[in-house]
């Protein structure tokens, strides 16, 4: 039984854990956020031997149904009137910024995408209006509702939006880098042995064929 689930951007969840929120498992859409906890934090740590790179995802460029956009691929996003873009502190925003650098559309360091601001992107893309969104869900909603012409989301986030979103392009990993979802058990000062064992068992279950079939239904792929 899961008594509480922390939901939000990886940065917010990571910070809450660092500030003392009790958590037995951390499941992240970004490797960097897991790495920070792996290095230890006040009152807790990642349990050795429990970290697993569980899933892959893919970043997609999307538009709303019947938008009539002139954008036919990632290289043409400057043709849009505006774009919903996740904040540079969250993984999908970082993957998108890395892709822009690797595609030579924006100057910067692809290994430090958090340093690339919305204004940097707008200037490089002919003044493209950027709607900064707190997380990937906000991007999906902004585009699906027609508030923004295009946006970047995970492929998994298009599930349930089939009647509202069109995928313009699935970005190759050569641009974004691997989109990996790591999971690990956490141990804090108040973690009991039963809680730790349950966390390990749950992580093991998520690696079974039964669990993977559910993930694949929602557009995730299995990390080999």
Where would I find each of the regions flagged by the language model?
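Exported/periplasmic ABC-transporter solute-binding proteins
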Residues: 14-19, 30-31, 38-39, 55-57, ...
């Amino acid at each position: 039984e899961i008594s509480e689930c922390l939901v939000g951007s990886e940065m917010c969840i990571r910070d809450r854990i660092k500030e003392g929120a009790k958590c037995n498992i951390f499941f992240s859409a970004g490797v960097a956020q897991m790495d920070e906890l792996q290095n230890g934090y006040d009152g807790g740590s990642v349990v050795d031997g429990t970290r697993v790179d569980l899933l892959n995802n893919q970043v997609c460029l999307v538009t709303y149904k019947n938008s009539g956009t002139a954008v036919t691929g990632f290289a043409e996003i400057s043709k849009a009137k505006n774009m919903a873009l996740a904040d540079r502190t969250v993984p999908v925003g970082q993957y998108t910024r890395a892709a822009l650098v690797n595609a030579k559309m924006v100057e910067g360091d692809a290994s430090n995408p958090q340093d690339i601001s919305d204004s940097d992107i707008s200037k490089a893309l002919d003044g493209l209006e950027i709607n900064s969104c707190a997380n990937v869900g906000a991007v999906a909603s902004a585009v699906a509702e027609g508030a923004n012409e295009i946006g970047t989301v995970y492929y998994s986030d298009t599930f349930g939006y089939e009647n509202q979103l069109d995928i313009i392009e699935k970005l190759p990993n050569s641009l974004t880098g691997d989109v990996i979802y790591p999971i690990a058990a956490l141990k804090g000062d108040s973690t009991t042995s039963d809680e730790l064992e349950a966390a390990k068992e749950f992580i093991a279950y998520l690696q079974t064929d039964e669990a993977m079939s559910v993930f694949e239904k929602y557009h995730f792929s299995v990390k080999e």
